[in-house]
Amino acid sequence: MNSPDTPTKITLDWKASEEGLTPHLLVGSIEQKVAWAAQEGGQRAFLACHLPEVLAEGNRGASKTDALLMDFAQDCGQGYGAEWHGMLFRHTYPQLRDVVVKTQKWFPRIFPGIRFTAGNQLVWTWPDGEFLTLGFFSRPEDFRNYQGFSIPWIGFEELTNWADDTCYKLMKSCCRSADPRVARLARQRATANAYGLGHNWVKRRFRLPILPGRTVGEIIRDSYDREGNLEEPRCAIHFDLSENKILLAAQPDYLNKVKAAARNESEYRAWVYDDWDIVAGGMFDAVYQPKVHIVPNFPLTRIPESWYIDRSYDHGQSKPFSVGWWAESSGEPLIHNGHVYGQVRGDLYRIAEWYGWTGEDNKGLDLVATAIGRGVLDREADWGLSGRVHPGPADGSIFNKDASGKSS
């Protein structure tokens, strides 16, 4: 028998049941089945992290969504009432279905008396008044629905669905509370897989990948916003399918299903291995294969006269611009260092690019159109292509004028 000064030992065990693998708490000699418990690894680290901004990242099936929901729920029933409330976003409304299903599975089991309202908004309301709204945020224009709100808990599910960080950063201005008890809890949380339209900006923001063998990534304390203000600290936390005992007990072959569903090598490596070093975020991800589409460089002066060379232009001034040079094969082959190019008429090669940026994300060179034009001609002369390059497509913004009459 323990003495009064000896703390009661509490342990967690997982046992098979008709409902699947379920958690059991052993408090001293008393065992009690519980509705939900954080699993070892990413889930526990995520729920214990007190930084104002945290990303749960990992491969498919790693239990990130459950952790996101419980991150909000763990502060319900603590006496804050309606002051503690949150907003969980998916990119589109249909994508909310999976979140709704998971909340309907867990919340009524854990919180007796909780109510779900499915009207103009999808809202879970706790008996003490706390509430979580499920919504979608497709475009920056949707921010007008939330501008001026105080929302102490904000979640983004599948963050790489957003092509850039605009929507994510807009909501940071709403992550606050006038109640000092709740203000100290205010936080922004997100989940993500590698791959998707937003792969690159999410990778940059959270400095992914996390070093192998680590669960918690670098705590980022040296990041500044566009105005030069120091941002709040943030980090990423790694989740892995191998940690999800519940899913693997119910579906031991789940990983094989993920492998079979992947449409290309990049998607496969992202979903199976959580590989952030893949090429992702573009229109052609589903068909892009580096072994096929990347070839060794060749001297541009060796391009046969029968090939057609032109250039494309994606305009930017305060934002980056891109000039692309293309060579289309006539069917006459080009042979260089044992490699044969252009054997098929119509083969298209991106032979060069001038990307006009400062080296800072999304920051252009602020060059006027005439300076860009001179830069194009200078480069063509350096490459030995003067007089060979035909004009090609350019986006319509080249005709826009600012107040001074200059192209913007």
Protein language model features and the residues they cover:
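Conserved RecA-like ASCE P-loop NTPase motor core of nucleic-acid helicases/translocases
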Residues: 84-95
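Inter-Walker segment of RecA-like/P-loop motor cores
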Residues: 95-152
